C-alpha cells in the first residue's frame, strides 16, 4: 500500500497548528489572576428576612476581624476554603460555600440554623433550640418566637419543648396567638396567649423513649387540646 507522505505531513501539521491556536487563544485570553482584584463581594443568606440571627453586615465584620474579607484583594490570594471554614465556626451557620469568578466577584452562600423556641429556665439558663432540636447559644439579636420558661433542663428542652414549639408553629392561629410556654414543677404545661388575660393549661406532654413515635404523639396531643380550645374561642366566648 502506497502512503502519501506529503499529504500525511500536511494533515499532521494542520492538527498541530490547530491545537496551538486553541491553546494560545484560551491562554492569552484568560485573565491574569495575579493582577485581577476582587471588585465585589456578594453575601447571600438563606432566610435572612425570617427568624434567623445572621445578616450580611455581621458576616462581613467576622471576615474582616480574621483579615479574610476579600474586597480589593488579589483574586489569587482569596482563600475560598478558609472563608468557608471560618464562617462554619459560627454556631448560627449551618452551611457555607464560597466561590470566585473570573470577573473579580466573590460569592458567599450561607444557610443558617433557625431558632424555634427560646428557653429561659428557672435556673437562669438562657438559650435557643433550633429546628433540629439542638441548643444554640444566646445572642444579642432578638426574634419573634415562642419563649419557654419554668422548670426546664436542657434534656427536656431538646426532647420535648422543641417538639411542642414545632407543633404550635405549624398552625397559623397558634403561631400568632401563643407567645409563651411555661413548665410547672410536675412538667405540666401552661400556654400564655398574646390576646386575653388568661392562662391555658394543657397538662403533661406524652413521654416516650421511642424517638420515631415521640413527635407524632406530641403532635396528636397538641392538636387535640388546641382543637378544643379553638372551638371554645369560636363558640364558647361568642355566647359569653
Placement of each model-derived feature along the sequence:
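Charged, solvent-exposed interaction patches on well-folded alpha/beta domains
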Residues: 1-45, 52, 58, 64-89, ...
Amino acid at each position: 500500500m502506497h502512503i502519501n507522505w506529503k499529504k500525511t505531513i500536511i494533515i499532521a501539521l494542520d492538527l498541530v497548528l490547530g491545537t496551538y491556536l486553541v491553546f494560545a487563544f484560551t491562554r492569552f485570553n484568560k485573565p491574569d489572576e495575579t493582577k485581577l482584584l476582587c471588585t465585589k463581594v456578594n453575601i447571600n443568606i438563606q432566610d435572612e428576612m425570617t427568624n434567623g440571627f445572621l445578616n450580611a453586615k455581621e458576616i462581613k465584620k467576622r471576615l474582616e476581624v480574621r483579615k479574610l474579607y476579600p474586597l480589593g484583594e488579589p483574586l489569587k490570594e482569596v482563600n475560598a476554603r478558609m472563608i468557608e471554614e471560618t464562617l462554619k465556626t459560627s454556631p448560627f451557620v449551618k452551611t457555607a460555600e464560597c466561590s470566585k469568578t473570573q470577573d473579580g466577584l466573590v460569592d458567599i452562600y450561607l444557610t443558617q440554623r433557625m431558632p424555634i423556641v427560646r428557653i429561659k429556665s428557672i435556673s437562669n439558663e438562657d438559650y435557643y433550640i433550633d429546628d433540629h432540636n439542638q441548643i444554640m447559644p444566646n445572642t444579642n439579636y432578638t426574634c419573634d418566637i415562642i419563649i419557654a420558661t419554668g422548670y426546664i433542663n436542657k434534656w427536656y428542652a431538646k426532647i420535648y419543648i422543641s417538639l411542642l414549639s414545632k407543633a404550635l408553629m405549624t398552625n397559623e392561629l397558634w403561631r400568632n396567638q401563643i407567645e409563651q410556654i411555661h413548665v410547672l414543677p410536675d412538667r405540666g404545661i401552661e400556654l400564655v396567649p398574646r390576646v386575653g388575660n388568661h392562662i391555658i393549661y394543657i397538662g403533661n406532654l406524652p413521654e416516650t423513649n421511642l424517638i420515631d413515635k415521640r413527635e407524632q404523639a406530641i403532635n396528636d396531643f397538641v392538636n387535640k387540646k388546641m382543637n378544643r380550645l379553638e372551638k371554645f374561642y369560636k363558640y364558647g366566648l361568642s355566647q359569653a
